[in-house]
């Protein structure tokens, strides 16, 4: 095995705004500006990474021009997560690499499609491949035209389109497959990589790039509508792509593709979001229902949430694996981590009680029933959820922001909203009466304990601060339109939590906004929805556009936006942000 300095994968992590995502529902890849596939967990979202460069670990798949100087750009196609990396070289050539994870996907097999094309002028490119599931090195490398084959950990590897590749020694002594090739103007080359679990059945006889691209394009066209009827068609299409790309065939939707990306440097606020949060999945279902597009995301959300309610009842967990399993508790990872954070896996939410997740579940079931998307067990699941609220709404819980246990106002109000909507469309006369009565009792008690003398909602009975999450329950029907408590809370959010047009979720201590944490992108879209509901469409559009400005160059959103540095913070892409963008874009066009 030859040592070759050029056989070094891109090692320096990039700013989060420079990454794009390709995904097939079971897993996703972060694509960096130098053609690096910096993050891929295999076989599913919460598995060990096979490409771990994002967090300083081994493994990756790079395709980039061979030249001293080039600048990067990129864009998504109109339908789905098909990404084009684009480079302009110092010699004046323009090169593109069209990239996707093949769809429809299989749970135990990932197929990575890359089509390199010289758009203008000739170009030389280099591809480097190092598949490292769980850190295991590639072994048993063989070439039998048209494939290179190898094994790594518990995975089998096939690589087509790189017949002239050679085995080189990588940075840590492991094997790297390296190939350099030339493209004349207008010429293209397909690279097809298959990573399959050892337990997978016999592989397809042929990894035909043309057929794989055609199937992938067809699948994405069916999943992503034009969205020309929204206030932001391009971003709405991307939101459909993100929500679809994060949703497993098992029904669960990963909250984000990544783990442990810091919200603030070296402050311990870096979490693993590769799991399916009940709340986030409900928000995604609402968004698709609001737009009325292809029902895949809504149908998956309803099926997943219904099954979890019927299985766990009043012990509903806030988050599950995408297959419905238990989320492990947070623990350190062996990876070095993204700069400013130590790597972790698992999530502490697995041990929390979050009342609002039950209320959101009722809202989702009611929305599905209104759109004829209810599961056979939906009515029973609604009864289970309502009973859980009746038994546990007096108990402290972690709440939407997953902090300390309290009687959070948002949690109670969102349950009142869920009960009212379920009573309207899911309950028989007896259930409807009981659920409405419970909603009235919750609202009365919350008004008694959580309304400030000025008439707005406080975060909790023992916390007078305003919270942007308190704008959500009125949007879902917890209170009638025009209710003065909602109006006062909206004004307080504008006065206390908005700076330079960006919205923060709440004030942290006595620090100015933007010091302890970034603007919370979700809250920007929530404020726009609240302003629209209040009849102030012009202001809602301004808020919507400001929130949209906090995206990556690819159009993806993370959880937070650092306004001062114009940087993304936290895991990416954050599903619930894209869900609220889609819902807001749909409602603003009404």
Where do the protein language model's features map onto the residues?
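Acidic, mature catalytic/reactive cores of soluble proteins
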Residues: 1-590
């Amino acid at each position: 095995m030859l040592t070759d300095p050029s056989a070094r994968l891109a090692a320096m992590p990039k700013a989060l705004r420079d990454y794009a995502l390709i995904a097939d529902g079971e897993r996703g890849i972060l694509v960096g500006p130098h053609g690096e596939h910096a993050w891929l967990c295999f076989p599913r979202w919460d598995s060990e990474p096979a490409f771990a460069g994002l967090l300083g670990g081994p493994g990756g798949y790079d395709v980039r021009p061979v030249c001293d100087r080039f600048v990067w750009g990129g864009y998504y196609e109109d339908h789905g997560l098909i990404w084009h990396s684009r480079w302009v070289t110092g010699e004046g050539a323009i090169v593109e690499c069209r990239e996707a994870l093949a769809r429809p996907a299989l749970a135990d097999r990932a197929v990575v499609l890359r089509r390199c094309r010289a758009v203008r002028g000739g170009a030389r490119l280099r591809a480097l491949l190092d598949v490292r599931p769980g850190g295991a090195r590639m072994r048993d490398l063989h070439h039998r035209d048209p494939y290179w084959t190898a094994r790594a950990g518990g995975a089998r590897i096939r690589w087509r389109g790189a017949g002239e590749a050679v085995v080189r020694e990588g940075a840590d002594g492991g094997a790297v497959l390296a190939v350099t090739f030339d493209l004349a103007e207008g010429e293209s080359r397909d690279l097809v990589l298959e990573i399959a679990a050892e337990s997978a059945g016999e592989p397809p006889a042929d990894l035909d790039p043309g057929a794989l691209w055609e199937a992938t394009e067809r699948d994405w066209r069916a999943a992503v509508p034009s969205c020309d009827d929204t206030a932001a068609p391009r971003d709405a299409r991307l939101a459909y792509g993100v929500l679809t790309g994060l949703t497993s065939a098992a029904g669960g939707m990963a909250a984000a593709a990544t783990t442990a990306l810091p919200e603030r440097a070296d402050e311990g606020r870096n979490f693993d979001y590769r799991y399916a949060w009940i709340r986030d999945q409900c928000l995604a279902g609402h968004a698709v229902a609001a737009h009325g597009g292809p029902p895949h995301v809504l149908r998956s959300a309803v099926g997943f949430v219904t099954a979890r309610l019927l299985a766990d009842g009043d012990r509903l967990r806030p988050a599950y694996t995408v297959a419905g399993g238990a989320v492990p508790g947070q623990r350190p990872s062996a990876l070095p981590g993204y700069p400013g954070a130590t790597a972790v896996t698992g999530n502490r939410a697995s041990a929390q009680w979050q009342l609002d997740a039950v209320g959101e579940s009722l809202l989702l079931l009611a929305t599905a029933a209104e759109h004829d998307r209810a599961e056979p067990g939906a009515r029973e699941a609604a009864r289970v959820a309502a009973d859980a609220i009746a038994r546990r709404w007096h108990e402290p819980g972690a709440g939407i922001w997953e902090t300390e246990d309290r009687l959070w106002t948002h949690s109670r109000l969102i349950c009142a909203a869920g009960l009212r909507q379920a009573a309207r469309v899911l309950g028989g006369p007896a259930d409807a009466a009981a659920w409405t009565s419970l909603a009235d009792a919750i609202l009365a008690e919350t008004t008694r304990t959580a309304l400030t003398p000025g008439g707005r909602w406080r975060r909790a009975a023992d916390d007078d601060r305003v919270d942007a999450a308190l704008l959500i329950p009125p949007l879902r029907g917890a209170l009638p339109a025009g209710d003065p408590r909602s109006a006062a809370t909206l004004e307080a959010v504008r006065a206390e939590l908005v700076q330079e047009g960006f919205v923060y979720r709440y004030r942290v201590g006595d620090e100015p906004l933007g010091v302890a944490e970034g603007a919370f992108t979700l809250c920007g879209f929530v404020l726009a929805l609240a302003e629209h509901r209040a009849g102030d469409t012009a202001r809602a559009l301004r808020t919507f556009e400001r929130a949209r400005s906090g995206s990556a160059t690819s159009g993806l959103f993370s959880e937070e936006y650092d306004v001062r540095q114009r940087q993304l913070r936290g895991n990416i892409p954050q599903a619930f942000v894209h869900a609220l963008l889609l819902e807001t874009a749909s409602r603003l066009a009404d």
